[in-house]
């Protein structure tokens, strides 16, 4: 059974965090976050790209219900998903940056390949 990280947040806060991170990732192409958040975000982002690759209206509405910005969902379908048509998974890359100065948490870049 897959164990999900709780990230010291309740369910609603954790889901909102993932929606925010996914929206930012698709908007900017690359974001810096902690390693634990990036590993959870990778699962979410890869599933959203796989859904977007279908390209039908039901898929668009499903993605639109998850992401916070409509223009980001549009870009996901028109620009991002077509790049990965011949690729089965592995749409993101995690690059370690080093520990954060304040608390030593491992910081990483997560980016679209």
UniProtKB/Swiss-Prot annotation:
GO terms for molecular function: structural constituent of ribosome. GO terms for biological process: translation. GO terms for cellular component: cytosolic large ribosomal subunit. InterPro entries: Ribosomal_bL17, Ribosomal_bL17_CS, Ribosomal_bL17_sf. Transmembrane segments: none annotated. The keyword Ribonucleoprotein applies. SUPFAM superfamilies: Prokaryotic ribosomal protein L17. Keywords: Ribonucleoprotein, Ribosomal protein. Part of the 50S ribosomal subunit. Contacts protein L32. Belongs to the bacterial ribosomal protein bL17 family. PANTHER family: LARGE RIBOSOMAL SUBUNIT PROTEIN BL17M (PTHR14413:SF16), RIBOSOMAL PROTEIN L17 (PTHR14413). NCBIfam families: L17. This is Large ribosomal subunit protein bL17. It comes from Caldicellulosiruptor saccharolyticus (strain ATCC 43494 / DSM 8903 / Tp8T 6331).
């Amino acid at each position: 059974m897959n164990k999900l990280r709780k990230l010291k947040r309740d369910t609603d806060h954790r889901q909102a965090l993932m929606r925010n991170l996914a929206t930012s990732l698709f908007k900017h192409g690359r974001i810096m976050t902690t390693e634990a958040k990036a590993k959870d975000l990778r699962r979410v982002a890869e599933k959203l790209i796989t859904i977007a690759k279908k390209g039908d209206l039901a898929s668009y509405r499903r993605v639109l219900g998850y992401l916070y910005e409509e223009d980001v969902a549009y870009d996901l379908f028109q620009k991002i998903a077509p790049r990965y048509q011949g690729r089965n998974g592995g749409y993101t890359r995690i690059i370690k940056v080093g520990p954060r100065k304040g608390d030593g948490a491992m910081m990483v870049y997560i980016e679209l390949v």
